[in-house]
């Protein structure tokens, strides 16, 4: 009997399963809430539940494969450490290719003379003096470096020389683009290197926490990490190339869905807390795409299963549209801890919500809370104002945004700390909406209802409340999730068949056909598209959300 424990850490839940590989039988399962401030708590809870139902000794476990959506979620949400990018032999025009400028955001970039020609010969000498000056300036301002050289896949010398100099001066993690891909396309290699550098600290926290729990439980088996193509990496190697795990969780889900459903051809949608991952089965297996993992709008140079990931999930942040006369809601791509869930950990949340509801005038920060995720303390590469705010957040614990940040400048700092993964956000989400409608009742119904009341009374540009009641607000939220999910499925299907990106959602006529039409509406024209394959939905909230989504796409 060959036994393995499969472990998956998502944005909301951590799951474990004990499997007899020889017989293909699941012997025990365990589920715990993912604890983002200390991942070992959720990991330990899930593994402990599995081992409690296992009669054998821990030494009988032969392997522990770990998959995670944390890297996927971080890329989709734009969360991660501050990265310094060195572009060697490129000019500023490189930033306009592969969406590199958008990926960098406010992170620093330096253009260094050097690089190579297509034949591998030196294009220009490497500017060591400029590198040295930049390294000393940035060593206390960033968490990691990314290095991309002109034609580095033909000759990586300037990338490796830059890496060695940065390592000697700063001691920080460094990602070279030629180590991640042998393909041409410098800006896309640079993009992939930036994403990799941002994810290093995140994956290190996860792997270290898992190794500590394994040691506590007496598990001596190898720890492996699932790659985006479904294969396995040794944990130590994964630490140097975390971008390889960017579709780890979706790849594991796809493999599991194919095994359980036994389908030969189908569209698979895995809805989690942060993302929906969409893939296609052909002859029972997914298709691999070399250098083409598509995650949250970024086309990377990572080999992975053909999976498309979008920022739609049960925990997507819901925000009111306050400008204009029509109002409405936006959804995602940022994840927020549901109010109904945070209330279980922090019961005084409901007191804060009630006090906000007692105010005569609604505030934009109503029903919005933050909590610190800084187990190693405040990073010193933050700005002075960000450091002060981070220290205040650690001292306060979970807090209303309005109490932590009383000015627009402070609110901007809060947003930056959230985007760096140092503060967690809690606000109204589709999970809360499902509590209000009664479709899901696992967490705190009262907190969800208070949040819905606060959201419903927010006013649009005409001074009109965006929803007539908490129930209307909840139904608006779920309708938007279902509409956007249906569009994502159809966009993925048409892209899979060569129809281009966003073929449905960018077409006003087709996109309009996915809106929920009131029963009283007398339409003169009806337009629609239909999915012509089986749909397999999985994920914690699939049973709640996918019946209406399937109906929308005609399955």
Question: Which residues make up each language-model segment?
Answer:
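N-terminally biased helix-coil "hinge/interface" segments that flank
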Residues: 1-555
């Amino acid at each position: 009997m060959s036994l393995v424990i499969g472990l998956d850490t998502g944005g909301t839940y951590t799951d474990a399963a004990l499997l007899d590989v020889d017989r293909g039988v699941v012997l025990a399962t365990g589920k715990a809430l993912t604890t983002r401030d200390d991942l070992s708590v959720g990991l330990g809870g899930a593994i402990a539940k599995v081992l409690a139902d296992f009669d054998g000794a821990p030494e009988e476990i032969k392997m522990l494969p770990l998959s995670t959506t944390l890297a996927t979620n971080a890329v989709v949400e734009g969360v991660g450490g501050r990265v310094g990018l060195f572009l060697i032999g490129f000019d500023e025009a490189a930033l306009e290719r592969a969406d590199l400028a958008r990926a960098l955001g406010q992170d620093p970039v330096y253009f260094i003379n050097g690089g190579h020609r297509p034949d591998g010969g030196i294009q220009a000498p490497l500017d060591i003096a400029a590198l040295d000056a930049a390294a000393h300036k940035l060593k206390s301002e960033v968490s990691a470096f990314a290095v991309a050289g002109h034609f580095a896949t033909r000759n990586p010398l300037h990338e490796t020389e830059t890496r060695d100099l940065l390592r000697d001066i700063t001691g920080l993690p460094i990602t070279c683009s030629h180590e991640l891909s042998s393909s041409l396309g410098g800006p896309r290699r640079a993009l992939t290197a930036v994403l990799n550098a941002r994810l290093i600290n995140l994956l290190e926290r996860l792997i270290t926490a898992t190794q500590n729990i394994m040691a506590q439980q007496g598990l001596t088996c190898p720890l492996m990490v699932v790659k985006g193509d479904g294969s396995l990496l040794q944990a130590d190697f994964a630490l140097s190339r975390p971008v390889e795990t960017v579709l780890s969780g979706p790849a594991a889900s796809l493999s599991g869905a194919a095994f359980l459903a036994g389908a030969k051809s189908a569209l698979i949608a895995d809805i989690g807390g942060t993302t929906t991952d969409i893939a296609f089965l052909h002859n029972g297996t997914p298709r691999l795409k070399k250098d083409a993992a598509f995650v949250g709008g970024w086309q990377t140079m990572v080999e992975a299963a053909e999976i498309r990931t979008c920022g739609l999930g049960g925990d997507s942040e819901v925000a009111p549209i306050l400008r204009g006369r029509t109002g409405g809601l936006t959804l995602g791509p940022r994840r927020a801890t549901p109010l109904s869930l945070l209330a279980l950990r922090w019961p005084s949340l409901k007191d804060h919500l009630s006090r906000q509801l007692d105010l005569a005038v609604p505030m934009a920060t109503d029903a919005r809370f933050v909590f610190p995720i800084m187990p190693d303390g405040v990073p010193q590469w933050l700005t002075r104002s960000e450091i002060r705010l981070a220290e205040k957040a650690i001292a306060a614990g979970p807090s209303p945004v309005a109490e932590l940040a009383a000015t627009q400048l402070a609110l901007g700092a809060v947003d930056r700390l959230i985007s760096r993964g140092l503060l967690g956000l809690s606000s109204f989400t589709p999970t809360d909406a499902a509590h209000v409608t009664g479709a899901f009742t696992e967490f705190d119904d009262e907190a969800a209802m208070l949040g819905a009341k606060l959201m419903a009374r927010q006013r649009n540009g005409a001074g009109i409340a965006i929803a007539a009641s908490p129930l209307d607000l909840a139904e608006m939220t779920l309708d938007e999730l279902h509409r956007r999910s249906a569009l994502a499925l159809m966009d993925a299907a048409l892209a899979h068949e060569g129809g281009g990106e966003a073929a449905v959602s960018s077409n006003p006529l087709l996109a309009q056909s996915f809106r929920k039409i009131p029963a009283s509406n007398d339409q003169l024209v009806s337009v629609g598209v239909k999915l012509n394959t089986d749909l397999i939905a999985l994920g914690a909230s699939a049973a709640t959300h996918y019946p209406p989504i399937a109906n929308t796409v005609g399955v």
